[in-house]
C-alpha cells in the first residue's frame, strides 16, 4: 500500500487528506477483516463506532455482523490508546 501524506486506501477503507471514512460494509461477511497498515490522520467512522481524533497505526477493522453496518477498530493504536475503539 502506498502512503502519501495522510492518504491511504485498502479495500472499503478510503481516506482523504483530513479524515478517514470507513464505508458501510454490512453486505460483507461478518468475519471480513481489513488491515490498516498506517493512516496518518483523524479517523471518523460513519456508523459512529470507534471515533478517533488521532492517527491509526496497525489495527483491524471488523464488521460486527450482529449489528448491521456498525464497524469497530480492534488492536493497533487508536487515538493514542492500544486496543479497543468501539463504544
From Swiss-Prot:
Name the InterPro entries on file. Answer: HssA/B-related
- Cross-referenced Pfam families, in alphabetical order? Coiled
Domain of life, per lineage: Eukaryota
Protein name per UniProt: Putative uncharacterized protein DDB_G0271896
Amino acid at each position: 500500500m502506498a502512503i502519501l501524506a495522510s492518504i491511504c486506501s485498502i479495500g472499503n477503507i478510503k481516506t482523504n487528506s483530513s479524515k478517514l471514512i470507513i464505508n458501510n460494509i454490512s453486505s460483507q461477511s461478518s468475519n471480513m477483516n481489513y488491515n490498516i497498515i498506517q493512516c496518518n490522520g483523524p479517523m471518523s467512522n460513519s456508523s459512529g463506532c470507534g471515533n478517533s481524533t488521532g492517527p491509526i497505526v496497525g489495527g483491524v477493522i471488523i464488521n460486527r455482523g450482529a449489528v448491521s453496518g456498525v464497524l469497530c477498530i480492534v488492536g493497533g493504536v487508536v487515538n493514542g490508546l492500544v486496543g479497543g475503539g468501539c463504544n
